[in-house]
Amino acid sequence: SYIKDVYLIRDRLMAQDDVMIMQIKDYIEMPKENGYRSLHMVIRVPVYFMNKKQLVPVELQIRTLAMDLWASLEHDIKYKCLYQTETENFSEELKECSRLIYEAEEKMEIMNRTLEA
């Protein structure tokens, strides 16, 4: 998946007449301090019961495979650091990894656009 696909999914959800957008947080354009990137949306979707329909809030975290890989590995590293007495502070290294992954994604997306043209 490419970065543009994240926004395509967002746009398609926004076009749905039965989905209500409550909140959008774009951590791709504005990454979190630790380097985390993702598009978060809180939406209300219809859930059908026997006698009624109810709009239920749902949080979506939409990201590319590379963003998901970074988030999973970052979580694993932070979790392990909680239980070790002598650990290095990896925050700068994690941010750098996030930046490098994002740059690679951008390059891959440019190559894909060139091939699609």
What are these regions (language model features)?
Residues S1-M108:
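Long beta-strand-rich cores associated with HINT superfamily self-processing modules
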